[in-house]
């Protein structure tokens, strides 16, 4: 990635679409369109964020270490192509475990998702999403609040490195960044 600005601008646009379409009015007007716009905003933002983080020197140390609160749910049945939706009876909804995970991990889960489903609020808007990668599908599903994901998107889109410290590592035969300061 040569320049991060266009990617961050696209991320901002995806975040704005997520906020714009996750309203009672949009769901009442055209539920399929609202859901599709939000789903695409979530998946596209995961790819953009992951790409930005993978390009050494483009994001600050704070962005690399940004943590998101998630809730883990254990499956009670084997998750397969025919049985992969987190409905009642497939997960232990009584024993959720809340923890903080790196945002980059959530991006990986989304990019490699086997399970993806949203939780709808009483007003018809999306409150959270459930995701499990192809690797974790029979171990855990993670629930991420939409508000947490939106905050993460905003943090990344406004992350600008103002100071960079690096040195050449003979063993790696490449430069290693030791400090990337956020401005």
Model feature map: region roles:
Residues 1-43, 47, 54-183:
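Acidic, Ser/Thr/Gly/Pro-rich intrinsically disordered interaction regions
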């Amino acid at each position: 990635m040569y320049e991060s600005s266009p990617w961050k601008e696209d991320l901002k646009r995806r975040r704005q679409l997520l906020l714009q379409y996750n309203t009672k009015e949009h769901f009442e007007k055209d539920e399929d369109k609202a859901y599709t716009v939000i789903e695409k905003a979530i998946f596209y933002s995961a790819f953009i964020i992951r790409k930005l983080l993978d390009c050494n020197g483009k994001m600050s140390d704070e962005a690399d270490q940004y943590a998101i609160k998630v809730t883990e749910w254990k499956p009670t049945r084997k998750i397969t192509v025919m049985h992969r939706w987190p409905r009642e009876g497939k997960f232990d909804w009584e024993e959720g475990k809340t923890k903080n995970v790196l945002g980059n991990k959530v991006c990986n889960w989304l990019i490699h998702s086997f399970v993806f489903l949203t939780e709808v609020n009483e007003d018809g808007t999306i409150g959270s999403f459930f995701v499990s990668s192809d690797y974790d599908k029979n171990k855990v599903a993670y629930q991420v609040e939409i508000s947490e994901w939106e905050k993460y998107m905003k943090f990344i889109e406004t992350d600008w490195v103002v100071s960079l410290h690096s040195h050449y590592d003979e063993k790696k035969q490449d430069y290693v960044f030791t400090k990337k300061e956020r401005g």
